[in-house]
């Protein structure tokens, strides 16, 4: 049996709308997300990057060679991701090439190495986005690293002490282990 339902009639305003413009192919790439390697210092429940066995890293010289092409594509910001970008053996050389080309840098980080690298982070990075997956106990459980929350808090404090104007924000992977604690995640971020 076929059931016919009345179809809504277009309103005069909707009927008079011009067609959408043709979309040209992507010719600009204002933000580039770069994975300089696949190492991580956490053992997160929801991620397997830490299981990677490759020791390969993106060389700073490669970035220097690619800069002209990136500038032609309109790259204005590079987001350093990973794993943990701060584990890259020549990260600051890589960042120096980006900075020299006038490209902004956002660092995504677990936060565990921010205390050690705070001076370089504020010298090279425009902003930092840390992973915060819950209040203390939940974050430590998800990250599977003892005192991960405490190390993150100390790292954020070190960055803010080195340069109060540097923006540090957080991101959270919502999952079974933390979805009931989202208000606490927001509270922990303050």
Question: Which sequence ranges carry the predicted segments?
Answer:
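Conserved alpha-helical substructure of the radical SAM core
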Residues: 2-120, 126-127
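Conserved radical SAM core fold
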Residues: 41, 85-87, 111-118, 131-146, ...
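Alpha-helix N-cap and loop-to-helix initiation/capping positions
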Residues: 58, 62, 143-151
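Anion (oxyanion) recognition and catalysis
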Residues: 99, 160, 190
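Helix C-cap/helix->beta junction micro-motif
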Residues: 101, 124, 162-166
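Structural recognition of alpha->loop->beta junctions
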Residues: 119-135, 186-190
């Amino acid at each position: 049996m076929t059931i016919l339902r009345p179809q809504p009639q277009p309103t005069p305003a909707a009927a008079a709308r011009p067609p959408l413009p043709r979309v040209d192919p992507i010719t600009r790439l204002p933000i580039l997300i770069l994975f300089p390697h696949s190492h991580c210092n956490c053992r997160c429940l929801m991620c397997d990057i830490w299981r990677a066995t490759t020791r390969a890293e993106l060389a700073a010289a490669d970035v220097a060679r690619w800069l002209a092409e990136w500038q032609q594509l309109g790259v204005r910001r590079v987001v350093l991701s990973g794993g943990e970008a701060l584990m890259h053996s020549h990260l600051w050389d890589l960042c120096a090439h980006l900075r020299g080309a006038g490209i902004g840098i956002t660092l995504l980080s677990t936060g565990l190495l921010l205390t050690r690298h705070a001076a370089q982070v504020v010298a090279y990075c425009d902003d930092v986005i840390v992973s915060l997956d819950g209040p203390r106990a939940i974050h430590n459980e998800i990250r599977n690293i003892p005192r991960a929350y405490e190390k993150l808090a100390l790292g954020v404090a070190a960055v803010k002490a080195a340069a109060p104007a540097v923006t540090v924000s957080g991101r959270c992977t919502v999952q079974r282990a933390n979805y009931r604690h989202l208000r606490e995640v927001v509270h922990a971020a303050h």
